[in-house]
């Protein structure tokens, strides 16, 4: 995916484009579309068959992963790890297709019911996001069989499921060895628009972005993005006249002189310090304008509708034209965050702390997420910067690609309008903050979209 930031008359729009090519190291280039198919019916098991002698096979975990992947990979899912016991089995899996999580859970549950031996009466499904186990949803096998065609099966399946925090590393869990280390890449076009206030000119730059990522271990990755202009008219930009440090207002200079540009080049380590505590450490060229070190901790129990977070960054502003160079400006930023999830897809977030220009303040945002993947929200920032732009407001909309293409996809078009070109109240533009990774897999949002479980 490529992100395009559009700046016109002080308003910034961000668009995530789904056009691109991707592949793995040594693999073929692929533009193969996916088409949604009806789910496979659940095969009823014999509850009297409690023989667990199948566990005596030394290769049983490997064999089970093989057959699960045979069923799941056509669905856009992938086995990350598997834990087998005589009466229960835990599947840790990646969801690469469905933007509504319960639909992925439903497909994974059907696969377990049709592959696991009859003695396994309990299934635990644990989605994995960038190496993080984000929640565990436990089903009784008989419930899946009884509720599949029940007229009230959606409600009953949710009420009887148990949503909890995953055990960080349960004994006996076996990972798929082919997943780590793993190299992946993507290539796609994007467009940037810039408005130069001093010359009152509207400018554009059509560019290509190449992304690469090496997943070394679960949660540990090295990644980077390089951009190159294809054509455009972004030129002769003049420095901003803002009295604050130009952390955002000189963005036109980054576009003009950054050709080619190493947009990001960083290492990320995501891990869980406890079942409900998520941690992120990032270092390198974190975004186009800043590089340094970033750390984040999130406390968010899977069955709870609120959470708390803390983020601290020590960064230095990058040079305009020097690919790896820096300017002299350094700053420490940090935020305490509170997250609230209400009924009907409504959520709120409050961030209080220090911004990139050295100003202090708070940001509040409210979003409404719909069961079809759409979302819309508003945000506002107020800081103590003694400038006219000390208040920033805007709104954002997410349009899922599957709404346009009518096929399942996690790709989305994200458009945000607001005064984000101002220096006051500006945060780092990080692409891997923790709450955005775990939110959709926790109880509140699962409940709001559970109607897709049997789809």
Task: Give each language-model segment a name.
Residues 25-70, 108-111, 116-120, 126-171, ...:
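Flexible, glycine-rich linker and terminal segments associated
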Residues 30, 206-216, 263-273, 292-312, ...:
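Feature captures outer-membrane beta-barrel proteins of Gram-negative bacteria and organelles
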Residues 35, 41-43, 69-92:
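Short edge beta-strands and adjacent turn/loop segments
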Residues 90-95, 185-197, 275-286, 307-315, ...:
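Transmembrane beta-strand segments that form the barrel wall of outer-membrane beta-barrel proteins
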Residues 101-178, 213-216, 221-301, 306, ...:
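Outer-membrane beta-barrel channel domains
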Residues 195-201, 209-211, 252-258, 268, ...:
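Outer-membrane beta-barrel domain signature
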Residues 196-204, 216, 230-233, 257-263, ...:
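Solvent-exposed loop/turn segments connecting transmembrane beta-strands
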Residues 203-204, 238-246, 299, 325-330, ...:
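Flexible, surface-exposed loop regions and adjacent strand-edge segments
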